[in-house]
Design a protein with these regions (language model features):
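Glycine-rich phosphate/dinucleotide-binding loop and adjoining beta-alpha-beta core of small-molecule
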Residues: 67-96, 101-104
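Gly/Ser/Thr-rich active-site loops/lids in small-molecule metabolic enzymes
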Residues: 171-216
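Short gly/pro/ser/thr-enriched loop/turn and capping motifs at secondary-structure boundaries
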Residues: 41, 94-99, 197-198, 213-215
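Structural signature of FAD isoalloxazine-binding scaffolds in flavoprotein oxidoreductases
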Residues: 115, 199-202, 207-212, 221-234
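ATP/NTP phosphate-donor binding region
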Residues: 1-64, 105-120, 131-142
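Short glycine/serine/threonine-rich phosphate/pyrophosphate-binding segments
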Residues: 14-15, 72-77, 187-192
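Catalytic core of DAGKc-family lipid kinases
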Residues: 95-176
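ATP/nucleoside-binding phosphotransfer catalytic cores, i.e., glycine-rich phosphate-binding loops
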Residues: 137, 150, 166-169, 215-243
């Protein structure tokens, strides 16, 4: 089995967890490859390991990716697996751990259970983003695990967000922005904006306006095979798109 190890934030504690995982894998004879940004934190042993680069598709021989950190790290790990379907095992070394599987105080036991194949796969929906005009920010990564959000940038005025579902006009939202959330993301920004909680296995997406002018504009749930086309207008020349 070949494991890719990923981390995004390097506190003393998280480095300790990474080293513990490395030692465990070495003791069990498993092959592994490390995210390149881990290298400078490993001291004298750093040159003895293999590394993979940021935003580059992982080797097809990788069986699993271990994301060591909190929920934010796990979300960022999507950028290195993209649509390769490599499973992610979350190891919590951060503050939040809603998406991670192995907790801090059960690290070794959790790894033992994993390599005994005492796990199950849970598939999560991703959102793919395409823009009419080329954007350098989306050159390497166009997928979102939690949500895609459109927000105001240089204005306090509302946005006019024209929304199409499968080429059929849905509505024009007058609001501060719009959240398109997956079931995974339904407990994040969308929830704090009045959206529903959706179970991870639900094959749907949530369309949720942020502070809409018309209070009758409530969140809408649509099938996850839906293609959304969104056109944004406002007093500002630019708007924010976040994944």
């Amino acid at each position: 089995m070949k494991i890719a190890i990923y981390s995004a934030f390097f506190s003393t504690k998280s480095i300790d967890y990474i080293k513990t995982v490395i030692d465990y894998l070495k003791s069990k004879g498993h092959n592994f490859i490390l995210f390149e940004k881990i290298k400078k934190h490993l001291g004298g042993l750093a040159d003895s390991y293999n590394y993979f680069e940021d935003n580059k598709l992982l080797d097809k021989n990788v069986d699993f990716l271990f994301s060591i950190g909190g929920d934010g790290t796990l979300l960022r790990s999507i950028s290195v697996i993209k649509d390769s379907k490599i499973p992610i095992l979350g190891i919590n070394a951060g503050r939040l751990g809603f998406l991670t599987t192995i907790k801090k105080n059960t690290l070794e036991e959790g790894l033992n259970q994993f390599f005994k194949k005492k796990y199950e796969f849970v598939e999560r929906s991703l959102l793919e983003v395409q823009t009419k005009y080329k954007s350098e920010a989306l050159n390497d990564f166009v997928y979102a695990l939690n949500e895609v959000t459109i927000n105001r940038k240089n204005t306090t005025s509302m946005l006019s967000i024209d929304t199409m579902l499968n080429d059929q006009h849905l509505t024009t939202y007058w609001s501060d922005g719009l959240i398109i959330a997956t079931p995974t993301g339904s407990t994040g920004y969308s929830l704090s904006s009045g959206g529903p909680i959706v179970t991870p296995s639900s094959k749907c997406i949530v369309i949720n306006p942020i502070a809409p002018h018309n209070i009758n504009m409530r969140p809408l749930i649509v099938p996850d095979e839906t293609t959304l086309k969104i056109s944004v207008k406002g007093r500002g020349n630019t708007h924010l798109l976040s994944l």
